[in-house]
Amino acid sequence: MPFRSNNPITRDELLSRFFPQFHPVTTFNSGLSGGSFLIEHQGQRFVVRQPHDPDAPQSAFLRQYRALSQLPACIAPKPHLYLRDWMVVDYLPGEVKTYLPDTNELAGLLYYLHQQPRFGWRITLLPLLELYWQQSDPARRTVGWLRMLKRLRKAREPRPLRLSPLHMDVHAGNLVHSVSGLKLIDWEYAGDGDIALELAAVWVENTEQHRQLVNDYATRAKIYPAQLWRQVRRWFPWLLMLKAGWFEYRWRQTGDQQFIRLADDTWRQLLIKQ
């Protein structure tokens, strides 16, 4: 249930007001991102989440709640409470592995997701690319970065092959291997977009695995594999710019050196693929 309040509350206030019988537990799912913790009562567990990006508008967090409210429980956690800066969702029991599942199994999960009703809001990458440029460290802004940004702005985003609800952050850490099948967590980037954008954004280990995932998906979706792969490739420069910009943005936000290393690695990939 959504609970409207303009006044932020503390963790203790949240628990005492809405979950008085629950208590925090110390075991965490490795797939959870920062700002999340588990609560438990008589074997029932919930995940209490906060926005990953403290500077993001509250509307982005609310959209995540709305997306989870629309999705079937067989692929995503069911939400129970939303209020400012807090969301409570089901804990998904299972294993979070360090590698992706079989490509055919993952293709089946993504194809099922893409058959669901659309969320109602579009994913557009250009505003994000421009935001990350504006919010990055001025010392890190280069002529090459600006040149690539202008090139994408002029080219415009690829026309969607098929418009569907997307997760947009599919990697091993966001996949729960449960007894009932694969499920996805961390839906903060969800929205409607091109199925090829989703496939392009999957954090794969190598090109061979990526091609196999696209081929397996194409079989289910009854699309020519070569056609789908061409569309996936059209999204590559957009996604690499998105990743690089996000790492730069997070570096300025947190000062964490890992983001500089990830940004530098992504810029190198962009130069190679040009």
Swiss-Prot record:
InterPro entries: Aminoglycoside_PTrfase, Kinase-like_dom_sf, Thiamine_kinase. Pathway: Cofactor biosynthesis; thiamine diphosphate biosynthesis; thiamine phosphate from thiamine: step 1/1. The keyword Transferase applies. Coiled coil: none annotated. Transmembrane segments: none annotated. Gene3D superfamilies: 3.90.1200.10. GO terms for biological process: thiamine diphosphate biosynthetic process; thiamine metabolic process. One of its GO terms (molecular function) is thiamine kinase activity. Keywords: ATP-binding, Kinase, Nucleotide-binding, Transferase. Its EC number is 2.7.1.89. Pfam families: APH (PF01636). It catalyses: thiamine + ATP = thiamine phosphate + ADP + H(+). It comes from the Bacteria. Catalyzes the ATP-dependent phosphorylation of thiamine to thiamine phosphate. Is involved in thiamine salvage. NCBIfam families: PRK10271.1, ycfN_thiK. Belongs to the thiamine kinase family. HAMAP family: Thiamine_kinase. This is Thiamine kinase. It comes from Shigella dysenteriae serotype 1 (strain Sd197). The gene is thiK.
